[in-house]
Swiss-Prot record:
GO terms for cellular component: cytoplasm; mitochondrion; mitotic spindle pole; spindle microtubule. The keyword Disulfide bond does not apply. It comes from Bos taurus. Its main location: cytoplasm. This is Regulator of microtubule dynamics protein 1. TPR repeats lie at residues 171-207, 225-261. SUPFAM superfamilies: TPR-like. Keywords: Cytoplasm, Cytoskeleton, Microtubule, Repeat, TPR repeat. Gene3D superfamilies: Tetratricopeptide repeat domain. The lineage of its organism: Eukaryota, Metazoa, Chordata, Craniata, Vertebrata.
Amino acid sequence: MALAVRFWCLFPVGRSAAWGLRLPAGAAGSRGQRVPWRLGASEAMGNSGTFKRSLLFSALSYLGFETYQVISQAVLVHAAAKVFEIEEVLEQADYLYESGETEKLYQLLTQYKESEDAELLWRLARASRDVAQLSGTSEEEKKFLVYEALEYAKRALEKNESSCAAHKWYAICIGDVGDYEGIKAKIANAYIIKEHFEKAIELNPKDATSIHLMGIWCYTVAEMPWYQRRIAKVLFATPPGSTYEEALGYFHRAEQVDPNFYSKNLLLLGKTYLKLHNKKLAAFWLTKAKDYPAHTEEDKQIQTEAAQLLRGFSDKN
């Protein structure tokens, strides 16, 4: 990160600049030789006062500059230390996330909840949401965490509108809040969610998670119940629309960008093929989801769902 720029050119540099008193014109003789510059007593006394004032002004200017240097250096050191601290916290946060230490991660990041760093804030939004999804979290706590996550994501986006992750987590958190605000709000939010997922993909076309989430948006809209579609048509001139084929395209695209990056992408590939009545490919992707190593609570839930869907195949056959 860039540090503050020091404007040295605005101040005198060194003692020579601070004490640079100029001799009057005519102090040299007609041939360029130096000659004594004799003054009368009263003139000498006047120049003595002027000299003292000039000396005092120069001294104060110099002291002021020295003070400015000390303060500037202190500010720079503090800023550098703060940047280093944030970078260190982000490294710890990423390690805890990869280790599946959901609650420890949340406890770490909430210590910095007043931060103005977008990278820290979107991670805090993600951590709040992950704690909300833990099986031991009560419904009351879950609702609080969901709204808390949205607030952190919103702040992250305000701090950096060019952040792919900030757009992504803002969209995710809006979707979560919709579960508490009714059908009308949920349908209205669908447009906002799509906009932010598309922006995240635009900012980083190699982010498999954003592509996957756009696939979820398409899948969710495609399976929207008839009564929700009717409400959408009444409330909006052009209600949100999509197809399972479109969803499938995003899920495959995410897999191409980063193979096996997420158990839920494997599960949804299987479920989408089921919607399209392709049981062979559905079984292939559901088996991959069932066999995916469980690192998180969500991975375990996905393993269970994939196994149940596969058993449904066996029972029918």
